[in-house]
Amino acid sequence: RFQESALFPGDPLVVAHASADGKWRFVVSPRYAAWVEAEAIAEGDRATVLAHATRAPYRVVTGAKPRTVFTREEPRLSELQLDMGTRIPLAPAAPNAPVNGQHPYAAWILDLPVRDADGRLGFAPALMPRIADTAGDYLPLTRANLLRQAFKFLGERYGWGHSYNGRDCSGFVSEVYRSMGVLLPRNTSAQAVSPALNRIALDASMDHEQRLRLMKQLQVGDLLYIPGHVMMVIG
């Protein structure tokens, strides 16, 4: 279990520490804190990082994992996977100007972070096809949308900590809810006590009938936590 979680393009981070060999950074993200390979992140000043993370207009990825279009001109952003719930601002580009050698007429022009040769933060445009599953804002938090978003992952391989380009149970529910603007912690232990959720604890004093009554009150999209695992009620 070397890999515990995942970061996504555009995630703002605090770099808190560096390894002795300089190959790793200990970072704090909105969802998790862990060691990350230094080559996987770009370092910039606080104002620039936070401005990009909050800038509008933007697109929210509402599909499971759409990709940007292929381009030889900018291989760092060619067919880049963007996972559900990722929020990327639109680039301030002229609507008819070529982007990476392609006309942007049928695509959204995203302003994505890139890592320069010296490890510093930069930005470059990339095209996301308009047919891809994205939205101009977070989806409304409804039970119907929770089901629609959840089933977009149907058939995907399970991946502990987002290994195998998949996701585990807590990553799954985190990204479903994130597409509706609800930010949950990364792991089940923290999710189960998150103030973002209306929590009902089942303790040892409750008998079977009491537990059954609570189960019957559950609605679509509600989350059930047991040690090390989370499940979503679908009806």
Listing of model-derived features with the role each one plays in the protein:
Residues N96-D203, P227:
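N-terminal capping segments
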Residues H17-G22, A93-A97, H229-M232:
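Short, charged beta-turn/beta-strand-edge "cap" motif at the junction between a beta-strand
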Residues A6, P185-G235:
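...with weaker cross-activation on analogous glycine-rich loops/strands in unrelated enzymes
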Residues S5-E39, Y177, G181-P185:
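Secondary-structure-rich domain cores
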Residues R1-P9, V28-R67, R72-E73, M84, ...:
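Boundary regions of SH3-family modules and the immediately adjacent low-complexity/disordered segments
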